[in-house]
Amino acid sequence: MILICRKFSGFFNILKFKYSNIKFGSHLRVVGKIGLTIQGRCSIGANFRCSSGDMSNAMGRNVSSYIKVGENASLSIGDNVGISSTCIWCDKDIRIGNNVKVGALTIITDTDAHSLNPTLRSNNETDGINAVKKPVEICDNAFIGTSSVICKGVRIGCNSIVGAGSVVTRNIPDNEIWGGNPAVFIKKIVL
């Protein structure tokens, strides 16, 4: 029965991606329910894998993946990327390279979503439009551990690893392991 549900959800999700004006490469595989709000540009490379909710990944529990691309924003996801029960909130520019793995329950966002000014934040008409937005880049072969938060304006370098439960608030150079809240340097990766 589970296999039938997975096949059906996969077919339904491919239709959902097509009708959301997402450009995607071959071998798209999305298992479980995924939320999509696409107002800007969104492109996804070949061999994209998304495990969403308890039907597909025990670590994701019953949390569905969600991808939001705001008006005039751009989300670009490379080839061979895998995500699990992940939220990607793009209001400006998010670029995810090739061969990136994103652990369950991770949040990637390029915006504060709300104004940091309490006067603007208290008014629904001025709140979101005054939120600070800065691009995010996750480079090739990066690995983001489960339950991490990737904040606006950061770059995670090639081959770098973010430990589980980390909050990334500043750039991570290539070939390094970072972790914690806020994430700090742990060690170099020797290739």
PLM regions and their residue ranges:
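A mid-sequence, solvent-exposed acidic-amphipathic segment
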Residues: A131-E137, F143-G145, G153
